[in-house]
Amino acid sequence: WGALGHATVAYVAQHYVSPEAASWAQGILGSSSSSYLASIASWADEYRLTSAGKWSASLHFIDAEDNPPTNCNVDYERDCGSSGCSISAIANYTQRVSDSSLSSENHAEALRFLVHFIGDMTQPLHDEAYAVGGNKINVTFDGYHDNLHSDWDTYMPQKLIGGHALSDAESWAKTLVQNIESGNYTAQATGWIKGDNISEPITTATRWASDANALVCTVVMPHGAAALQTGDLYPTYYDSVIDTIELQIAKGGYRLANWINEIHGSEIAK
């Protein structure tokens, strides 16, 4: 996701993080701000663009070597790659965020990475190798020539919300939380975190990746990439996918909160 999506995931998470876990996370991040997660949600994207952080680029995705739209699947052993991927990163930083042998800066970095990568995993094209996760599928959206990946990351969410400031993300998150509390998502939400376990991070994160990857076949490109390259994706394609984008952002926030709560719970138990 782009800045709007990541901040919205973080604001949804902030709603569901327990007060005790919130204090713990604020202590790690050195922030008592009301946007303590949202304000750092895109740090990992900024970091990977620096010379010091370019090593981390592969951690933002897993390249599922499948065959959409005919076949979508994630295989951790097949797809993760020697330089790591989102799944291995979530496992690594889940361990590092509370490793007492590491520095407070290591802990803060780990939490910043977790906030970002758990969000990225719900963007279907971050769980897909085809055309570099859709980056090489050139399309037109609302009159602009861009690529399918950036439309999913940034331009379609911004079209829905109308901006990308923290205040826009906070407003969107409130709507998504309402849907979780008493709306379209209420019956689904417990299923989003079913079986999630910080002691089994590879298994858990692979399930998250598989959940989003399946949408590449059913929602993102159900008729293949070529079908998206004629005409403008707005409004017909946009209308067909925007509900899924909202659902995936909500899932990311709900899962992130549960993950933080579980990590904090294991800290207390030590």
Swiss-Prot record:
Residue ranges of the region described as Substrate binding: 116-164
Enzyme class name: hydrolase
UniProt xrefs under InterPro entries: PLipase_C/P1_nuclease_dom_sf, S1/P1nuclease
Predominant location: secreted
Superkingdom assignment: Eukaryota
Cystine connections: C72-C217, C80-C85
Pfam family, one: S1-P1_nuclease
Gene Ontology biological-process annotations: DNA catabolic process
Family: Belongs to the nuclease type I family.
UniProt-recorded name of the protein: Nuclease PA3
